[in-house]
């Protein structure tokens, strides 16, 4: 039965269809301009950039320039890259310009599509950032598309690992900058740890287009970027705690895979208590006494490291280090570390060198970093399933862009087996059959371990020539994935390794040219060889098409439908045929943890025999339901985390804005005076409460505060004896004395040095207190959840207490800054005492009138070519004097020592 909603969609079309229809009309207007632009010479086409910029300077909007700018970029792409953006790419480009997310199928040309809004928005000169997931893609796209932008007179930079500040600053100053989300985020944090504007590398955040937007803004949303500094080395303690876990029995702990938690049972707690007591690390009577909080934290981390984290799935061991594996892409994430001691627990488990724990110096989540841009948009092959999250958190509307040619891929129903063993036997049979008929196969696995187990099975079965692509072989990723479309190729890949590189049937021309002709110079020979490679690829493509196109065979379903859709989407690009199928078992993680018991019972009733599969659309629907449940739970987690991070983010913005203001201030006298007066007011109100009797005054405490915070010795005891003196009078006298001392110091230092000192003290103190504040917020975050048991809202509690901590930090800042400024003194280093020659004197020879002492000095140093004999020196020409000792009489004849005469000007 058709619902009213379904009926309405049939008649009027979905909101997506209506939006696409409107944009298609605009795309047709741009296409109508194509003939005009084809008739322009290269010089006339290039002159369009200056013409558009002049129009913007006169007040025209980017929207009004869009048709002509898109037509210009399209024509330039045809001439420079040999590629013409289709109308659907124009539609996608408009979505990106209008702060949206363009969902385009794999192979539809997202990289080329992005050049249209990038060119248009770069005309403003405020900077456009194109964000990708790794350095390889950033460099590749900057080089390839950079030819188009350079042709149109725009500058292009690329931010990648290993650049120094000057190189980064130059790249950010370009009209268009390519870079990874990590590099951009860390540059922002590093900029906000600098002490001068000139040292900063980034410009204000204007416009960003995020490639693989779902991966960056959703999969990595929970991962904060953290710059940290090392704390004390506690590797012995981690190793000791680690020895307690392997001997534990199953009854000693409980693991909840769904919630990803591991906790000790009562029996387990008693066991580790005894072990700790024997090692001398148990304080008090019980493990859960307040003195053992840190020990409990380390024990829980060690338990999680052993029971929740799997080697070759969650991390790998490489070069004596634990390298985290991205659970969504299967890529290694070198440089990333788990926080709060978990990474050290994994290092202890795997017996590699334990790195010291780190203190957070600065941090930000991708959610909050990308929300700083004035304008944000993104593109991906799969975003529709997360449309609600993109809308709620980033205010981005997802639009599904129609394909240029109809999709010919056949998505087959899942095959479900009872056991993993049966499933793998079926997979190997299917791979053998497809391989023998010459069909290229992409096999998707969920972990390194599983990809290598499958590879071993294929070896045992005698299937040769397959490639394994996982985090271990990250360096060859692009080449392996690019050749996955060759007839008979079998490529085993973890999750979405290789995203960003197209799988083209017959092979990838660009990759083969790079690989096979790297040492062949430009010329007829190279052109001939490229033509031969093209012909070979065309022949191989025909074979692959005849075999049915690319076959995507997935060995397991992921928690997220989006990741499954990404894998499916590798097949059937640009109208090519293809097929996809998922092989599952009841022992798979998703089925075991989230699948309903009803499905298990249903399969048992059917009485499946060994190696027999069940295939039915109902199974697909039940699995999709389980995936939706997981997605909803993960969305709630991310949304909740963002609410907490927003509290810190508001404070971060205040602090970072304050730092920028300090950098720009040329005179901080008023700011410092205000801080000084606030410190004095707080001091007086604490020791002499308003309207309190004189007997209640703490004069001794006030005197001590004045000495410690203002470095002054004031006769407050005498003032207290005066008849009728009130707290305001104390306040005014202390302010007057402190202002006088500060003014005298400023006069001694001079305005330039004083401003430099004030700026340095304020910013260093602010940075140190902010770091401590981040630690305090982390501690508050870790315990505030327990307030829920007392029927109090943890988020509101966190907001209230975080604000109080922030207020305390600002009060401490005033005290620390004023205390340091009232004590600071400039110590000028005395110049070293000059070494006098052994015979200091003057002896004029009566016969010659020459200074015998000068001759003696010259004789003493005659091995030095720069020494000129006194008789050869012209008193009127310093160029003839050569090297002169500082304590010699000046050769000019003044009678003064050289250092007090001509030497003083050196």
Swiss-Prot record:
Disulfide links within the chain: none
Name listed for the protein in its UniProt record: Protein translocase subunit SecA
Gene3D superfamilies: 3.10.450.50, Helical scaffold and wing domains of SecA (1.10.3060.10), P-loop containing nucleotide triphosphate hydrolases (3.40.50.300), SecA, preprotein cross-linking domain (3.90.1440.10)
Keyword Cell membrane on entry: yes
InterPro entries: Helicase_ATP-bd, Helicase_C-like, P-loop_NTPase, SEC_C_motif, SecA, SecA_CS, SecA_DEAD, SecA_motor_DEAD
Cofactor(s) required, per the database record: Zn(2+)
Organism for this UniProt entry: Brucella melitensis biotype 1 (strain ATCC 23456 / CCUG 17765 / NCTC 10094 / 16M)
GO cellular component: cell envelope Sec protein transport complex; cytosol; plasma membrane
Keywords: ATP-binding, Cell inner membrane, Cell membrane, Cytoplasm, Membrane, Metal-binding, Nucleotide-binding, Protein transport, Translocase, Translocation, Transport, Zinc
